[in-house]
Amino acid sequence: GGDFFVLIRLDRGQVGLPVADVSDKGVPAALFMMSSRTLLKGAAIGTVDPGEALQEVNELLYEENETLMFVTVLYSIYNPETGRLTYSNGGHDAPMLVRPDGSSELLPLTGGVALGIAPDIEYPSHTVQLEPGDTVMLYTDGITEAMNGDGEQFGVERMHEVFAESPPENSEQALKAMFDAVRNFVGDTPQSDDITCLVVRRDEVGS
């Protein structure tokens, strides 16, 4: 069980980027994760609307969900040519937009509950225009809920601080800065949850 992500090649050079977190651990959760991942890939290929894809996957998971598990998903579609990022949220953490000067903000959530819980749920989509140098962090709650020896969580505010102190110059640097910050905060405390983070960045040549 735990986190997963998929990189899906779509038409017109677009990329589908689902980031997800399954509710449980163990063998049943691992099977549920595999099923969720397969269904997401199939739904993504059939539509360019991330909300429609989540709605389709939710219905399929709910029909067969005898274990009463669920999966939170943030599904984004990025167009490198235009810099447009369209996303839909199923009970997941809000993506973080980081500007070239290091300022950052959480992008608005779109509503929509975790997948597999209930049928007939609508998943609205939202589009943001990335400018050159903009970076978007797609992550799971393993980052925000990472805990140190005093029982404090890393939290969203520390995510903002990571980039305020050192604006990312590329995707690799953004990812390393985030993981280093979490690692330094946690110290020797055992990791209790999966930690997953994807980076979408638009640079001067549209990638």
Predicted regions and their residues:
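Conserved subregion of the PPM/PP2C metallophosphatase catalytic domain
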Residues: 1-23, 27-33, 37-207
